[in-house]
């Protein structure tokens, strides 16, 4: 025998799509130079490529590429802008340091190191 179970009396979930702009962090920056100083990694040297803070804040990765900014710096700036737009604390994230010659060379470097100890 099959039993029919009544459907729930609750309406389907309602999805709200926001059309407002992203809520930026409470920290505000006067110029692009201030932001680039805050994020560190010597990105302040790129401040001359941006006339205003709004130009940097609303930039896309392709905009930064057109300005001649290298991929590593572009990726770092875009990550920090993403954090800023999501209200996260802005701080310098130091570059990682390779151990044992990096992932690809690790086995070779460790083998040479161990061979040199004997």
UniProtKB/Swiss-Prot annotation:
Predominant subcellular localization, coarse grouping: mitochondrion
Transit peptide start and end: 1-24
Pfam families per UniProt: SAM_Ribosomal_mS41
Tagged with keyword Nucleotidyltransferase: no
Protein location: Mitochondrion
Entry GO terms, CC: mitochondrion; ribonucleoprotein complex; ribosome
Keywords, sorted A to Z: Mitochondrion, Ribonucleoprotein, Ribosomal protein, Transit peptide
Highest rank taxon of the organism: Eukaryota
The protein's role, per its UniProt record: Involved in telomere length regulation.
Family: Belongs to the mitochondrion-specific ribosomal protein mS41 family.
The protein's name in its UniProt record: Small ribosomal subunit protein mS41
Organism: Yarrowia lipolytica (strain CLIB 122 / E 150)
Gene that specifies this protein: FYV4
């Amino acid at each position: 025998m099959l039993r029919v179970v009544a459907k729930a009396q609750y309406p389907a979930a309602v999805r709200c799509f926001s059309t407002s702009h992203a809520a930026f962090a409470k920290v505000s920056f006067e110029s692009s130079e201030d932001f680039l100083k805050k994020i560190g990694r010597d990105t302040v040297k790129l401040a001359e490529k941006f006339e205003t803070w709004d130009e940097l804040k609303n930039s896309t990765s392709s905009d930064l590429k057109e300005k001649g900014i290298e991929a590593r710096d572009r990726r770092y700036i875009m990550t920090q802008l993403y954090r800023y737009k999501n209200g996260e604390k802005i701080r310098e994230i130091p570059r990682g340091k390779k151990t044992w010659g990096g992932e690809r060379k690790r086995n070779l470097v460790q083998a040479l190191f161990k061979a040199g100890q004997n």
